Amino acid sequence: MNIYVEANPYLHDKYSKYADEKYKREGNPFVSFPIHFDDIPSGAKTLALTFIDHDAIPVCGFSWIHWTAANIPAYIGELPEHASEERQDLMIQGQNSFASPLAGSNDPKVIHQYCGPTPPDKDHAYTLTVYALDAELNLQPGFYLNELYQEMKEHILAETSIELLARV
């Protein structure tokens, strides 16, 4: 399985810290980047994804979850730009780290959707992982990352990751 996101080598500003203010909510970028999928294994029914900043550990003490989504149709070929907000029919989305009491947001449009990179201290590498699954997962909107991992456990046919950079 392959995934492709346009980045040279940085994620486009529109999807990260330097997004125009009209593409920010509570100071954070909300337009999700397009993701292209190919060589999906036969037998895959759905895809799931995680977008996580492990470089956040020295800053806040834990890996920062920017996006989780599940039950994306395996046949889709591409998750289009801004799908997190405009194509919610294509997936269910979980909570990101802004849902934490440490971050303090309670706006569902911030905590239950893509919230793009805003590295505070240096350029960060963000890990996008896509999973091909043999089933639709029994998750509700606003699920937690650990629930996604638990539900996927016996259903992963393939998994692939890429790192995307965002500038400070």
Curated annotation (Swiss-Prot):
InterPro entries in alphabetical order: PEBP, PEBP-like_sf, YbhB_YbcL/LppC-like
CDD domains xref list: PEBP_bact_arch (cd00865)
Name this polypeptide is given: Uncharacterized protein YxkA
Gene assigned in the entry: yxkA
